[in-house]
Amino acid sequence: MKKPVSSILAAALFVAAAPAFAGIHYKSSTKTEDARGHSSEVQVEGWVAGEKAKVEFKESTNPSPATQKGTYLLTKDAGKTLYLVNPEEKTYAVWDLNAMLGAVGSIMNGMGPVLRIQFSEPKVEKVADEDGGTVAGQPAHHTKYRTTYTTTVKVFGMGRSNDVVSEQDFWTTTRLPDAGLGVWLRAQPPRTGNADFDRLLTTERYKIQGYPLKMVTVTTSTDPKSGKSSTSRNTMEVTQLDTSAAVPAASFEIPAGYKEAQLLPTKEGSRD
């Protein structure tokens, strides 16, 4: 009987001695329904301590391989340098969303007369600015914006326009100071490098204070000629939040032996 007891005691002492940060642990769900009624959901679990953050994809019906179950994002500097880690393949890769979307923007800019996508100057209205009750146990402030603009797609000079109305609700909190939260809980999308589209991303609605604990975006696009419209909906919500969690320091380390992969051209390397 002594051996099991001593083994349990040794394990307990090991756990107690392992370095840990006083940090934040949360769970979040993002649900998307497109104009055709197709839906997807991504559930994540996050650990944050100051500028350090780990965001693991727990469940996903999104077809992107980056969000497959078990894959996670890792940073030590609030997302300035971000890694996508794949435990199944034992690989890690620099995750630079701005660079990826910038490549898309370059393609949009380079299509010239073949394909041109234009966005009119957006009109932004603040339609709500009030107490938002509590979300995941945190006091929240609710703001709502209505943004209207026109998109025009031209192929070889022939164009079609749509009038777009985007209504976006934010429930934000300023009670959480940890910068690592911004890796996942962010209101402002990354830039694409396309001037017209990026103008939409710098509107007043993204100049909110604190971190969003819940966001709901409903976008309706209407063809002015036919009158037909389509609507998409996106909802992100933090469902659980512990602000005094013990977060193991090892949570923010890439495991030894993982090899570097490439999402975009980068220098080769590995962690032995």
Q: What role is predicted for each listed range?
A:
Residues 1-9:
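Bacterial N-terminal signal peptides that target proteins for export
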Residues 21-272:
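Extended soluble regions of mature proteins
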